[in-house]
Swiss-Prot record:
Pathway: Porphyrin-containing compound metabolism; protoporphyrin-IX biosynthesis; coproporphyrinogen-III from 5-aminolevulinate: step 4/4. The keyword Cytoplasm applies. GO terms for cellular component: cytosol. It comes from Ruegeria sp. (strain TM1040) (Silicibacter sp.). Disulfide bonds: none annotated. Gene3D superfamilies: 3.20.20.210. Keywords: Cytoplasm, Decarboxylase, Lyase, Porphyrin biosynthesis. Its EC number is 4.1.1.37. The keyword Cell membrane does not apply. It is found in: Cytoplasm. Belongs to the uroporphyrinogen decarboxylase family. This is Uroporphyrinogen decarboxylase. GO terms for molecular function: uroporphyrinogen decarboxylase activity.
Length: 345
């Protein structure tokens, strides 16, 4: 029955009359049931590392909305923590990490093979979900792309322009490339373990890919994505991979072929008609409604949703947002989006 799942059919290249739908950050603070479970966990990281509660928040949007996929509840910064970086979250400000800016800092990191000790609760979450999800729902695992994860490890926090990572790339290229290689190796291990625990699809989030230009994009966004995808395909040939090089612009063209991913997720700066012509010709695309519509709602939500469905209707497409849903979103607007996508069913 596995291939009857709508997400897997899209990822296999099938054009469907009604695209399957899920939503980045669909388990999140916009949902009252999520806020209640997070309060029970105590804090964000405790929620990530509690398999029963992490599975519960992953299931909540499936119960409420009947999305075609559930995405594992975790965080891209668990990998640096598993490598030995200190990680904590500051309320209202986001993540903080101990920084990796010198060879001595890098030497303190553990080998990629050691990540499973820290990450084993995540695999348990996947195992619980693979048992508890409805049979028609696809389970998606994920990790951050090496470049994006490195930007946090180098700066110790999110930065508007990823300046510290760009500076290290220029000033100590061997260290920068060694860090990327370590993250790449750990990511292959992590995603492979998620698949072995029951993930049916994996997604690589390169949230800051757009700040890499020209040759740097090819070396530090495309190449790690290619390495991760190739390694996963060698071990798990039937498991599809979704790549998300956010704000890659023209570099979305050719991303399927250059990396080997089965699907390319598009941010909402991308014109859907342009992407249908230039990106979807190479394979499945995912996206790309602006997440602001989940806040504002109204007729604009319906019109933009219909436009995206129509633009991508001639090829394989998974409907999603172009960015994660925000905490101020209205849950009713999510339902309206889903109803609009499925109105042709």
């Amino acid at each position: 029955m596995g291939q009857q799942k709508t997400i897997l059919r899209a990822l296999a290249g099938e054009t469907q009359a009604v695209p399957p739908i899920w939503m980045m950050r669909q388990a999140g603070r916009y949902l009252p049931e999520y806020r209640a479970t997070r309060a029970q966990a105590g804090d964000f990281l405790s929620l990530c590392y509690n398999p029963e509660l992490a599975a519960e928040v992953t299931l909540q949007p499936i119960r409420r909305y009947g999305f075609d996929a559930a995405i594992l509840f975790a965080d891209i910064l668990l990998v640096p923590q598993a490598l030995g970086a200190d990680l904590w979250f500051v309320t209202g400000e986001g993540p903080r990490l101990s920084t990796i800016t010198t060879d001595a800092d890098f030497a303190k990191l553990g080998p990629a093979s050691d990540v499973h000790e820290t990450l084993s609760p995540i695999y348990e979450t996947v195992r619980i979900l693979s048992k508890e999800l409805p049979s028609e729902t696809t389970l998606i695992g994920f990790a951050g792309a090496p470049w994006t994860v490195a930007t946090y490890m180098i700066a110790g926090r999110g930065t508007p322009d990823q300046g510290p990572a760009h500076a290290l790339m220029q000033e100590n290229t061997p260290l920068f490339e060694a860090l990327l290689a370590r993250i790449t190796e750990a990511t292959i291990s992590y995603l492979s373990a998620q698949i072995e625990a029951g993930a049916e699809v994996v997604k690589i989030f390169d949230s800051w890919a757009g700040s890499l230009k020209g040759e740097a994009f090819d070396k530090y966004a495309l190449e790690p994505a290619r390495q991760i995808t190739a390694a996963l395909k060698a071990r798990h040939p039937h498991v599809p991979v979704i790549g998300f090089p956010r704000e890659a612009g023209e570099k979305y063209i050719g991303f399927h072929a250059a990396t080997g991913v089965d699907c390319v997720a598009l941010d909402n700066s991308v014109d859907p008609e342009w992407a249908a012509e230039h990106v979807q010709v190479a394979g499945c695309v995912q996206g790309n409604l602006a997440s602001r519509h989940m806040v504002s709602g109204g007729e604009a939500l319906v019109q933009d949703t219909r436009r995206i469905v129509k633009a991508f209707s001639k090829g394989p497409h998974i409907f999603n947002l172009g960015h994660g849903i925000t905490p101020d979103a209205d849950p009713d607007n999510v339902q309206r989006m889903i109803d609009t996508v499925r109105e042709g069913a």
